[in-house]
Amino acid sequence: MFANLLNAVKDGVKRKDRFTLDELRRLNDVVARTTAVTTANRDALVETFREIAELMIWGDQNEPTFFDAFVEMRTLTHFSRFINQQARHRAGHRQGQPARGGSHLTLQLLQTLSIMLQNIQLETSLFYLFSNNHVNELIECDFDFDDEEVMAYYISLLKTISLKLNPATVQFFFDYGDGVRGGNKK
C-alpha cells in the first residue's frame, strides 16, 4: 500500500497538472463539506485523503506553498475530526448502535499521516504537524485495537513519529499536567 502511494508521487512529473493548489483546495473542500462518514461516501473520502497525502508530499519536495495552503485550510483539523468521529461511532457500536463507515477511513487516515510524516523534509512543516496537539489527539484516540490492521497502522504511525523526534520536536509531546502541551509553559 505504501509503495503504491510513493510510486504515484514519484510519477508526479508525468501527471504534474494534477499537482496544483486548486486541486488541494478542491480536495480540502470535499473533506470540509462532509459532515459524517457513511457507506455511500466512505470510499470517496478514503481516496480524497490518499490524494491529499500525495499532494502534500509532492508539495513539500517541489512547491512549499502547498504546505501553507494545507495550514490555512486547517486540513489537519479534518483528520482529527474524522478519526474522533470514527471512535465515537465505534463506542456507539459497542453500546448496541450500528457502526457506520467501518475502519477503512481510519486506516487511510493513519496511513496518510504516517506517509506525510515519513516524507516531509522541511522542519517547519514537521513542527506544524506536531504542534497544535493534532498528533497528540490522534495518539490518544480510542482506536479499535481488536482490529489487527488498525493496530498495525497505529504502531506504524508511532514508529514514524519516534523516528522524527529530536530535541526540537520532542517538546510538542510534553504534558505538564495542567493541560499545557508543547513546551508552552511559562
Task: State where each predicted segment sits.
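Elongated alpha-helical scaffolds that mediate protein-protein interactions in large eukaryotic proteins
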Residues: 1-186
